[in-house]
Structure formats: C-alpha cells, structure tokens
C-alpha cells in the first residue's frame, strides 16, 4: 500500500474500531463499505482507492441497491 493509502486508511480503521460496534453493521452491500474502502486502498492505491470508496459510500443509502459489490480488479499493471 502506498503512503497515501496508509494515511487514508487510518480514518476507516478508526471508524471500524470506535463507531462501527456502536452503530451496528447496517451496510447494504457485501463486503461492508469499510472493508471495501480498505481493500480498494490496498489494491488501487490512495487516489483511485479513495475515488472508488467515495463512489461506494454515495451508493450506500436506503433507496439504493444492495447485494454483492466487490472492489474492481486493477486493469493496468503497476
């Protein structure tokens, strides 16, 4: 993971550690949005991983879809 991806993963890990047990596991998608964010940052790095995470969070609302929504694979070689 790039240094930017590590930095962007800190708030996600803090959310999972502090807030997620209190608010419950209510994500409409599988994997959960926080797991998706960490996987996207790991696979795609800071910029693209953050973009994918933002798009996913914007899709996760009561009137949106639900179900299996994996992180897309990288299309280019690193």
Swiss-Prot record:
It is found in: Cell inner membrane. GO terms for cellular component: plasma membrane. The lineage of its organism: Bacteria, Pseudomonadati, Pseudomonadota, Alphaproteobacteria, Rhodobacterales. The keyword Cell inner membrane applies. This is Putative membrane protein insertion efficiency factor. SMART domains: Haemolytic. Keywords: Cell inner membrane, Cell membrane, Membrane. Could be involved in insertion of integral membrane proteins into the membrane. InterPro entries: Membr_insert_effic_factor_YidD. Its main location: membrane. It comes from the Bacteria. Belongs to the UPF0161 family. It is a peripheral membrane protein. The keyword Transferase does not apply. It holds the Pfam family YidD.
């Amino acid at each position: 993971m790039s240094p930017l991806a590590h930095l962007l993963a800190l708030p996600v890990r803090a959310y999972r550690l502090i807030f997620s047990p209190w608010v419950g596991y209510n994500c409409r998608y599988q994997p959960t949005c926080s797991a998706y964010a960490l996987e996207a940052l790991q696979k795609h790095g800071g910029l693209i991983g953050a973009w994918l995470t933002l798009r996913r969070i914007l899709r996760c609302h009561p009137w949106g879809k639900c179900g299996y929504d994996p992180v897309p694979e990288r299309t280019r070689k690193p």
